[in-house]
Amino acid sequence: MSKIVSINAYEVLDSRGNPTVKVELTTEKAYAEALVPSGASTGSKEALELRDKGTKYEKNWFGGKGVQTAVDNVNEIIFPALKGKDVTKQFEIDKLMIELDGTETKSKLGANAILAVSLAVAKAAANEANVPLYAYLAKLDNRQAYKLPVPMLNVINGGEHASNTIDFQEFMIMPLGAKTFKEAMQIANFVFHTLAKLLKEAGHGTQVGDEGGFAPNLHTHEETLDFLVNAIKKAGYNPATSGDNAVAICLDTASSELYCSESKTYTFKKFKKALDEKRPGFEKYASMKYKFTSDEYVEYYGNLIAKYPIISIEDSHDENDWEGFRKMKKLYGNRVQLVGDDLIVTNPKYIKMAIEKDAINASLIKINQIGSLWETIEAIKMTQAANMVPVISHRSGETEDTFIADLAVAFNTGEIKTGSLSRTDRIAKYNRLLKIEQELGNKAKYEGRASFSNLK
């Protein structure tokens, strides 16, 4: 047993230049630090990220986005409650913080306050045991950590993550034909830089969005997908969902951002705006449909799935459009991974609901959506018990913290979504996974297409 001696929280900046919480935790024998991320496209049921708007700290940072209130809660409420506690009692500590908060969404202390401490506790315990973080996390659930996740690399950004004309939020590639994680990174490297070359040749910019993917002003989703397919081919790989040299495509459409609850329709808002403003090049797409009912949206996805090597779609419908998700699962669930994000917000309560409604076959796991390591692990376990895949995910406002890389390996989740091959806040996670693969040596396993245990 080693007791918690000190916890010090303070404000630092995330990848968007907004404040976030950093915690430094010291025990009798070890030290650790943790930083928490922040999302832009968020589900309404997420645990609350406490910001300073409406408090005495409101003017400290732009838009009242400071987190000094959360920092104070760590230093003045959480630390006194945890001082002297055994750092290896992860779940007991997490439950105590949740009880201290006493609200369903952690709105009193802030999910950002609780999570920062929760992660620091795990890191300190691992450091004290002198074992890698992934090995320590695996032992929390009596597991053996060996599986490197297949990365979903967000190479084109749109939606809330970029100031461009693309409505779907993320266009990703998955190196399914690789034999190791390092080879997956090599494949991604070739495709990413080939895509940059193709975009430049077509007269598009290669500026990047929040998650490091390119953010060109393309006209349609189909045009965007065509660029991806061509980049995969020209890089020397096969745009396919299985087989040798296969590189598949994944989408995060973030459809809650496109939904109107009054009309119950989905609208490609950026596309419509470009048409209304008569932006050059959009006139030839004037007759293209951009507004859909839920059923029409399902059909639209079907056309994309038939034409392109799409293996995964996240948030295909609005977080409250359960019927839309159910229809997607019924029609395409055997051959396409259908991931719930805003639908379930890493919350076991909503994951259970999604399982009962047969709405998805994969859960996106974001540690700050639920706000503690214990609850995150419960979400992963519930997902895997239902033969669904837990996809470990970053947020658009990230930090240099690499906790999620270790988490993916610890629970053999098989998939990770942590941005493109640019921006250090994204690359840090990939570099950590490369290090883990090296440490595991012959024990390391990269499953590629077989990671989709939820598909036939």
UniProtKB/Swiss-Prot annotation:
The active site is at E211 (proton donor), K366 (proton acceptor). Keywords: Cytoplasm, Glycolysis, Lyase, Magnesium, Metal-binding, Secreted. One of its GO terms (molecular function) is phosphopyruvate hydratase activity. This is Enolase. Pfam families: Enolase_C, Enolase_N. It catalyses: (2R)-2-phosphoglycerate = phosphoenolpyruvate + H2O. HAMAP family: Enolase. CDD domains: enolase. One of its GO terms (biological process) is glycolytic process. The gene is eno. NCBIfam families: eno. Its main location: cytoplasm. It is an enzyme of class 4 (lyase). Binds a second Mg(2+) ion via substrate during catalysis. It comes from Metamycoplasma arthritidis (strain 158L3-1).
